[in-house]
Structures are given as C-alpha cells and as structure tokens.
C-alpha cells in the first residue's frame, strides 16, 4: 500500500494521491524482486540442506572463482557473475534424487543421463529471474570441456564462454580435492 501526506492546503489532493499510488507500485516492484531472490535462495538452500557436500562444493567453487577472477584481473561485473554462477552452478541438481548426489556408489547409464541434465535445469531456473538471467548461460555451459567431450551441447575450445571455463576448472579442482566424484557404471 502506498501512502503520502498532504502537508498544506496549497497542495493538490490529486497530486498527493498520485504520489501515494506511485509509492505503492514501487513497493510492489521491490517486493516482487525480493520474492524472486527468496525463490532462488529457497531452491539452493533446499539442495544444500538435503546434501551438505553440495553446499561445501558451492562455497568452494564460489571462492575459487573469486580467486581466479582476481588473478585474471576481471572486471567487477564479471567477478560478481563468476562468484554468483560459481555458487549456483549446480542448482539444477535440485531435481535429482538425493542418493544420486551422494557419489559413493556406481551409477547406471540411465542415472548418469539424469545427472547430465542438471546444467539445463539450472539454466531454466536462473533464466526465469531477472537478477540471475546474466549467469544462466554460464551455468548451462559449466560442464562443457575444451576437447568437446562435455555436456549438454558438446561445445569445445573457445565456443565455451570464458567465465564458464573458469567455473568448470574451479568445479573440477574442488571435486578432485574432495574426492566426491561419482563412478559411472561401464
């Protein structure tokens, strides 16, 4: 609800009403943005609550991305994108069964194909919100590999956006350090 005060008789009542209405629309817009942010936070928090390793991984990847951005002298805008995308890169895993995230057993080809969809799901989630649309493409491409063996598009070399390559490197480094890699059943 908007509100304004008519502070003197010389002020037109309709101007006061117009200001109150404008304040109301601003409040609604800001509230909508807050709800959108809360939605993303709720999704990632749900994923992290169900799998604490994913939370640790997100934090580590974000930190590694920030460090690499500083070393590479990236702009403040690219650094923020990289940190945000680094933290949210696996948000698409929210649709996976928790046991697939545990990585302590061999998985079937069918399960592997389900896991490989997480960048697409993450892209769809982040592309739905104005405040994350600029990182959606990075999340989509974070599993691409320089030699073209990645997924979902099989991009290779410089077809992969630089920031997505940095996320892939940070993620791979963290996974190797934490020895959380799932083993695909051959």
Protein language model regions, located:
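A short glycine-enriched loop-to-beta-strand structural element that forms part of the catalytic core
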Residues: 1-21
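Histidine- and acidic-residue-rich, metal-dependent catalytic cores
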Residues: 39-186
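Catalytic core regions of nucleotide second-messenger enzymes
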Residues: 1, 32-34, 131, 159
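HAMP domain helices
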Residues: 20, 32-43
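Charge-dense, low-complexity intrinsically disordered segments
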Residues: 7, 14, 30, 52-55, ...
